[in-house]
């Protein structure tokens, strides 16, 4: 009899705790509209992808313990997706097409819903093709709960102002990807970081130049991409 009473007590206690946790959860909703747009950062008009009319995508703010509910409206002529970089969440919400979900097809809506299980500054981006390179990236701020034992008053309650630094190139991202795989020195030449044999001889480094040629890596491994502009929160630096 006593064992039965204890069992009933434990079950009731667990249910009460669960109901308290559920009532404490706050659902934070964002609506994201994905559309084609045109930008001009270099004097040339190029295609980009804007979300809610902006690049980068909107900064989304949550508090640890919240439930994120993100509605994605795909108004592109191609499929898309969103991946939450570094977040601990259910696998089905991870946003990788054909792996954890089907792509969000043109003209359709997809809802991501997951608990915010951590705090910190993170970012999210498209996981479809090379859409990230033309605008589909943004920041996420996950605030610490004020009842967290590690919460620092006067520090953790200060407003967070995200600064997103990114690069922009007028080249089509698919062309960049192809050129990198071709392993040419094109981007190094554009950056002015290559050295000819004549320059090596002039500087007295002919032997070093020859030795380096025998052990050099492929250009795609050592040459960064040449960018036309650097952007600060989507604006020219």
Where are these regions (language model features)?
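Histidine-centered copper-binding motifs that mark active-site loops
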Residues: 25-237
